[in-house]
Amino acid sequence: MVFQGFAEEKSWHGICVFIKNKTGCGTQMTVPVCWRSRTHGDKSKEWEAIMMKYAVLSGNERFEIREGELKSNGCAVLQVTHVGVCGTDTSYWHEGERYRGVVIGHEYSGVVVAPGTNRALKPGDRVAGYTQNVFQEPCGHCEACLAGDWDHCTNRRVFTWKGGELGHPGAYSQYTTWFPHSLVKLPDNVTNEEGAMAEPFAVGLHAIQVSQVKPNDRVLILGGGIIGMSCAEWARTFGASEITVSELNPQKREIIRGYQVADHVVAADAPDLEQQLLDISGAAMTC
């Protein structure tokens, strides 16, 4: 699922999305954007501020479209093209009153406007980002940061919290800023829509690596959401010979069958689930 553009209304009471079969709302809006350049020959600060529109949580199951100034603060500046709807995002949306003022969105792709200090990037490059940084800013000088382990920074701070300065907003915005070291250039054979799914597919890859799936392994995946489907895709890539997905939601089960990522799809709440799994695996149980 991906957002693409903003609705005309001033607030959202629901989430409009694009998915592969083109359902959902499909209106894209082009909004004039005003850059203000304050450069003095320093290319890392070529763009310092921009007026843009962004979606902010304004209550339970409610977004509000606002306009504000985004400062580059020396970071890379990106134009967001696609952003995924993560389960974390929907949790924030349902509890929007608690998270009022937060700009979410961390599964995204975009186009570089200003690369900041990343010399490997240039304006116009298509990128995806290391998404943990949308929720927290690493300090860059603690022991964890110096080891490259930014997730465990001991001095991290949260962005756009409780209506504070826009700072580094999530990707439910026209533009966002990102730490230059957290951006990955998309290869030519990966579309921006596919690039927005880099984060959930990285989660699936990690799960399969940790599970040490090998060629000809038979794999059972508990849960068939985007992460479960990602695990199934990676299990196949790693050579699994048979993949079974167990899922509670009947709609998700049909989606999994439609994408043909698993050999067997079973209802997680089936009274005979244990026997089904034994039959699929060809195993037997003795007491």
Can you describe what each PLM-predicted range is?
Residues 10-11, 15, 21-23, 39:
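Polybasic, lysine-rich low-complexity intrinsically disordered segments
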Residues 34-51:
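Short, Lys/Arg-enriched N-terminal segments with co-localized hydrophobic residues
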Residues 71-83, 96-146, 187-189:
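Glycine-rich beta-strand-centered segment in the early N-terminal region that forms part
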Residues 134-222:
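NAD(P)H dinucleotide-binding glycine-rich loop of Rossmann-like/cofactor-binding domains
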